[in-house]
């Protein structure tokens, strides 16, 4: 049996309002639990449209047919009008999710984090994280124990900024296996659970067709030599591609794959995890930099 961590990112108002309820119903039908990471502040995702001037981002949007994939309400959110507060508008849905699934913070403002966190100071990072955690805890009525950086925009500064929140783990980067980030010689931070597998929008196109994606990604899960972690998005697999995701759950079960919340991947003694660090890097299919796992020495 292959155990795969299932991470569900919720970036937008529509993803929370429409995608999450469908995903909850789908997961319930198949007896699967996952980790949901919510954006809880303003939905300003439409402000990413300026990035269309960048060839790699434009190609990604064309390759994934973004208008039909996400919908124009997502693509224009926060452009001609102020972005609506996601958490306030969908508190009931978020609370229901936290009743059945591991629930953590994705971002206060997904667009702001993805656009500006790379040059924020440690204090600005801490204030933004605190704002999101405070809002999410007020909604779910219990402590937030995990987080996942929006767009995988993370580096050593983000690791340090999250240390004061006493989280059980973070999932801030792409990599191969769980690790303890090295803060300084002799001091390690909160365990990291990297995403190891590509997302739908990173690979779909000429190389991998939509109808063959499930077969392709299951093969990648079975071949993963580290600790497999797969990310879906409420805006994609929870709405337009919900039937495809349901088919994936069936095929994965038949292939001997068991999905689980990311927290279940942690060992009883996190001190046994290898050391590592998060550095800025790039991966195929995703525009811009993101946090990538790198080995580190204890000395």
UniProtKB/Swiss-Prot annotation:
Molecular functions per Gene Ontology: hydrolase activity, acting on carbon-nitrogen (but not peptide) bonds, in linear amides
InterPro entries, sorted: ArnD, Glyco_hydro/deAcase_b/a-brl, NODB_dom, Polysacc_deacetylase_ArnD
UniProt EC number: 3.5.1.n3
Keyword annotations: Antibiotic resistance, Hydrolase, Lipid A biosynthesis, Lipid biosynthesis, Lipid metabolism, Lipopolysaccharide biosynthesis
Reactions catalysed according to its record: 4-deoxy-4-formamido-alpha-L-arabinopyranosyl di-trans,octa-cis-undecaprenyl phosphate + H2O = 4-amino-4-deoxy-alpha-L-arabinopyranosyl di-trans,octa-cis-undecaprenyl phosphate + formate
Single GO cellular component term: membrane
Membrane-spanning intervals of the chain: none
Annotated NodB homology domain residues: 2-260
Signal peptide: none
SUPFAM superfamilies hit by this protein: Glycoside hydrolase/deacetylase (SSF88713)
Domain of life assignment: Bacteria
A GO BP entry: response to antibiotic
UniProt pathway annotation: Glycolipid biosynthesis; 4-amino-4-deoxy-alpha-L-arabinose undecaprenyl phosphate biosynthesis; 4-amino-4-deoxy-alpha-L-arabinose undecaprenyl phosphate from UDP-4-deoxy-4-formamido-beta-L-arabinose and undecaprenyl phosphate: step 2/2; Bacterial outer membrane biogenesis; lipopolysaccharide biosynthesis
Reported function: Catalyzes the deformylation of 4-deoxy-4-formamido-L-arabinose-phosphoundecaprenol to 4-amino-4-deoxy-L-arabinose-phosphoundecaprenol. The modified arabinose is attached to lipid A and is required for resistance to polymyxin and cationic antimicrobial peptides.
Record HAMAP family: ArnD
Similarity field: Belongs to the polysaccharide deacetylase family. ArnD deformylase subfamily.
Protein name per the record: Probable 4-deoxy-4-formamido-L-arabinose-phosphoundecaprenol deformylase ArnD
Biological source species: Salmonella paratyphi C (strain RKS4594)
């Amino acid at each position: 049996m292959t155990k795969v961590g299932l991470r569900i990112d919720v970036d937008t108002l529509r993803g929370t309002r429409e995608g999450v309820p469908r995903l909850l119903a789908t997961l319930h039908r198949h007896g699967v639990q996952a980790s949901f990471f919510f954006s809880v502040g303003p939905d300003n995702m439409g402000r990413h449209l300026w990035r269309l001037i960048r060839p790699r981002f434009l190609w990604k949007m064309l390759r994934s047919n973004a208008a039909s994939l996400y919908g124009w309400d997502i693509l224009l959110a926060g452009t001609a009008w102020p972005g609506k507060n996601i958490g306030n508008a969908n508190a009931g849905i978020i609370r229901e999710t936290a009743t059945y699934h591991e629930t953590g913070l994705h971002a206060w403002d997904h667009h702001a984090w993805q656009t500006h966190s790379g040059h924020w100071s440690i204090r600005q990072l801490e204030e933004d994280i605190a704002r999101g955690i405070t809002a999410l805890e007020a909604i779910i009525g219990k402590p937030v124990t995990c987080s996942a950086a929006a767009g995988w925009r993370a580096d050593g500064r983000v690791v340090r900024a999250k240390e004061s929140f006493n989280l059980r783990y973070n999932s801030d980067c792409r990599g191969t296996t769980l690790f303890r980030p090295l803060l300084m010689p002799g001091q390690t931070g909160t365990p990291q659970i990297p995403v190891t597998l590509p997302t739908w929008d990173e690979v779909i196109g000429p190389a991998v067709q939509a109808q063959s994606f499930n077969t392709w990604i299951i093969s990648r899960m079975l071949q993963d030599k580290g600790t497999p972690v797969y990310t879906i998005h409420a805006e994609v697999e929870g709405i337009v591609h919900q039937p495809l995701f349901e088919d994936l759950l069936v095929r994965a079960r038949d292939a001997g794959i068991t999905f689980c919340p990311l927290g279940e991947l942690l060992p009883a003694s996190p001190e046994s995890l290898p050391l590592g660090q998060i550095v800025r890097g790039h991966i195929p299919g995703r525009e811009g930099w993101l946090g990538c796992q790198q080995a580190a020495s204890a000395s």
